[in-house]
Amino acid sequence: MKFIGFIAAFLMIGTIILPAQTYKPAERVYVKTSDYVKGHFNGETPKKKATIWVIGDLRDDINEVLNGADSTPVRYRYWRKDNKTLWMLNSVARTMSITAGVVVEDGKIVDITVMTYRESRGHEVQSRHHRVQYVGASITSDNNLTNSIDGISGSTLSVNSMKRMARMALLLHNDATSDD
C-alpha cells in the first residue's frame, strides 16, 4: 500500500513540475544562409561582407521602425554586389525572433524569405502567398512600405515583424548605396 502511495505522489509531483518548465518550440530552418546568398548572387558568394554602422539619422529612422519592439543594433552586416544588397535580419514576433533574408535592388524589395522561424504559431508568414506582397515595395519618406501588406489571421505579430524587417532592409539599403 505504501508503494502505491509513493507512486501516486511521484506522478502528482511530475505533473506539477513538468508543465512549469519553459516551453521552447523547435526552430524551423527553411533556408540556409549560404544557399540563400548564392541563390541571389548567381551562384557566388560575394567575397567580403560589408558593414553599415547605425548612427545619426539612420539610427533615428530605424528606432522609429522598430518602435521599441527590438533593440537597435550598432551595426549590420550585409552582402553587396553592384546595386543589390542582401540583409539577414532578426525581429521578435511574439516572444521569439524570426530570421529573414531580404534582397533589395535599386531601392525595391526583390525577395523576402523566412530563414528561421522560432515561434510556436504564425509560421504562415513564410508562405509564398504572403511573401509575394513585399516584392517591388520601396520605402516612403515617412518610413512606410509603398505596398499594402495583408495580414494573416492569428499571425498578426509575425506579419508586423516581417514588415519591420522589410522596412529596415530598405532603409539600410538606401543608406548603404547612397554613396554611389
Predicted stretch roles:
Residues 16-20:
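Sec/Tat signal peptide C-region and signal peptidase I cleavage site
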